[in-house]
Amino acid sequence: MNSTTQAPQPVYQWTADEAIRFLKEWNFSLGIILLFVTIILQFGYTSRSMFVYVVKMILLWLMWPLTIVLCIFNCVYALNNVYLGFSIVFTIVSIIMWIMYFVNSIRLFIRTGSWWSFNPETNNLMCTDMKGTVYVRPIIEDYHTLTATIIRGHLYMQGVKLGTGFSLSDLPAYVTVAKVSHLCTYKRAFLDKVDGVSGFAVYVKSKVGNYRLPSNKPSGMDTALLRI
């Protein structure tokens, strides 16, 4: 029997001229996309625009699956064994970190019941009970004090607007910040009225425990929280 040997297929490689031509063709589109992403990341804060902040969170959330796909692609089309080894390590690390993100987000969701638990930027959720409605908003840092400000009926917590139609008498005695492993309780330590419809209050961290629900009572705080 006659056996035929197939010639190996040549490996296609980009030349410098092709790379320059690609940049010339897609430079405008890439510039617009990078400008859009930069603006979103720069100005995406809850204290500025909630819509822009949500778009920012979507972009950050998409980074993980995109990174995993690119790492897997590098594993399939690795240039050599060294690149293959690094690609496998990066793929495993990316998948583990993504799984950890979902595990922590689900734990935080069980604690708060808020979809803000899946925020990829932070695991700190500030919970404020106003007239029986619990407002949950993400905060970046673990603050020792929280500030509530009311300006002509508009309520702001740490600079984030929560709603309108409130007065200083509506401010709760306690505010909570939920984390993955515990819940921090902040007690109102100072209240000052600027005029008849404006003022502010300062809350100081007073208690840390493993609870599921934020307090919604001015007294009897331990009975208002369900221990996990």
Swiss-Prot record:
GO terms for molecular function: structural constituent of virion. InterPro entries: M_CoV, M_HCoV-like. One of its GO terms (cellular component) is host cell Golgi membrane. Residues 2-25, 78-85 are virion surface. It comes from the Viruses. Residues 47-56, 107-228 are intravirion. Glycans are attached at residue 2. The keyword Membrane applies. It is found in: Virion membrane; Host Golgi apparatus membrane. Keywords: Glycoprotein, Host Golgi apparatus, Host membrane, Host-virus interaction, Membrane, Transmembrane, Transmembrane helix, Viral envelope protein, Viral immunoevasion, Viral matrix protein, Virion. It is a multi-pass membrane protein. The chain crosses the membrane at residues 26-46, 57-77, 86-106. Pfam families: CoV_M (PF01635). The keyword Translocase does not apply. Belongs to the betacoronaviruses M protein family. Component of the viral envelope that plays a central role in virus morphogenesis and assembly via its interactions with other viral proteins. Homomultimer. Interacts with envelope E protein in the budding compartment of the host cell, which is located between endoplasmic reticulum and the Golgi complex. Forms a complex with HE and S proteins. Interacts with nucleocapsid N protein. This interaction probably participates in RNA packaging into the virus. This is Membrane protein. The gene is M.
